[in-house]
From Swiss-Prot:
Its main location: cytoplasm. It comes from Mesorhizobium japonicum (strain LMG 29417 / CECT 9101 / MAFF 303099) (Mesorhizobium loti (strain MAFF 303099)). This is Uroporphyrinogen decarboxylase. The lineage of its organism: Bacteria, Pseudomonadati, Pseudomonadota, Alphaproteobacteria, Hyphomicrobiales. GO terms for molecular function: uroporphyrinogen decarboxylase activity. Substrate binds at residues 25-29, 44, 75, 150, 205, 320. The gene is hemE.
């Protein structure tokens, strides 16, 4: 059975051992070939919007490590950028946006949204043509809450206090922003699927900073709306949700959003992850710093996950993205350990 079918079967709730394997941010700065392509591209957004270069960097980790899945190289902030918002990336500072006002939120719309994102769709089409048949292609978007935090503050913050405060002070405007982002993100994922994505993932990197009521309003509801809209058009395409930092609310998130697979961060106890497997596939959850450290810290972490979760529906991954300082040899060691694992 081709490995692409194995990953899709895992997302249907089946167990396979060894599990399929890929890494968040697997096309990134830890790879010298990525750094060279990034240098040639100019700006980060130029790299995202150039299909030739975006395909090149997406394929680099597949060619080097043979991962079971390839994730489109892009960024969650192309959605606000395609909606006409100013987005730029500065070395050492990350993403910078012009903070959005209440009036701008209420007028937020673009009749050229898909035109602006056509280079991304072209990248997906080319990837599906170039990838090995056994490699699953993953499309993605950012969750409305996480994208909104950057649009409100204009940059990342430690606890996203600007967005939380804005949401409390301007609830109607904030809910409108989440609805606009949910609708456009769903349309974006649908186009990625139609271009060739086998699976899509929704990244909610800042879900862990919210209280219970806000988590339900700002994280769960918008993602549930995306899932509803995507499944109305493509009911058989799996959707992975990754609400990083959700803690005890992972179960509620899965139940209320309807996601197919659940990405879990490294803080989730393996006993809790095992319990989550009872309702479907989980993806994760190696601490990225174990991969940086290597040696026994790495092998013990991999072994613990495989032992606890390997007999259920598991997609082996990190609990967040790989960091730039990660040695390539450590990635090779992780891949070898997962692939050679025996029950």
């Amino acid at each position: 059975m081709p490995k692409s079918r194995i990953m899709l079967d895992v997302l249907k709730g089946e167990a396979h051992f060894p599990p399929p394997l890929w890494m968040m941010r697997q096309a990134g700065r830890y790879l010298p070939e990525y750094r060279e392509t990034r240098r040639r591209a100019g700006s980060f957004l130029d790299l995202c919007y150039d299909p030739d270069l975006a395909v090149e960097v997406t394929l680099q980790p597949i060619e080097r490590f043979g991962f079971d899945a390839s994730i489109l190289f892009s960024d969650i902030l192309v959605v606000p950028h395609a909606l006409g918002r100013d987005v730029r990336f500065e070395e050492g500072r990350g993403p910078l946006l012009t903070p959005i006002s209440v009036a701008e939120i209420m007028a937020l719309e673009s009749d050229v949204f898909h035109v602006n994102l056509e280079p991304v769709y072209e990248t997906v089409r080319r990837l599906r043509a170039k990838l090995p048949d056994e490699t699953t292609l993953i499309g993605f978007c950012g969750a409305p809450w996480t994208v909104a935090t950057y649009m409100i503050a204009g940059h990342g913050t430690p606890d996203q206090a600007p967005a939380r405060l804005f949401a409390y002070r301007e609830p109607a405007a904030f809910q409108h922003l989440l609805k606009v982002l949910a609708d456009h993100s769903a349309a974006y994922l649908i186009r990625q699927i139609e271009a060739g994505a086998d699976v899509v993932q929704i990244f909610d990197s800042w879900s862990g900073v919210l209280d219970d009521a806000s988590f339900d309003q700002f994280c769960v509801w918008p993602v549930a709306e995306i899932v509803r809209q995507v499944q109305a058009v493509h009911p058989d395409v799996p959707i992975i949700g990754f609400p990083k930092g959700a803690g005890a609310r992972y179960r509620t998130y899965r139940q209320k959003t309807g996601v197919t697979g659940l990405g879990i961060d490294w803080t989730v106890p393996l006993a809790a992850a095992k319990d989550l497997q009872r309702s479907g596939a989980v993806q994760g959850n190696l601490d990225p710093l174990r991969l940086v450290a290597g040696g026994k810290a790495l092998s013990d972490g991999v072994e613990a996950i495989l032992k606890a979760l390997g007999d259920g529906p598991l997609i082996f991954n990190l609990g967040h993205g790989i960091t730039p300082e990660t040695p390539i040899a450590h990635v090779e060691a992780m891949v070898k350990q997962v692939r050679s694992a025996a029950r």
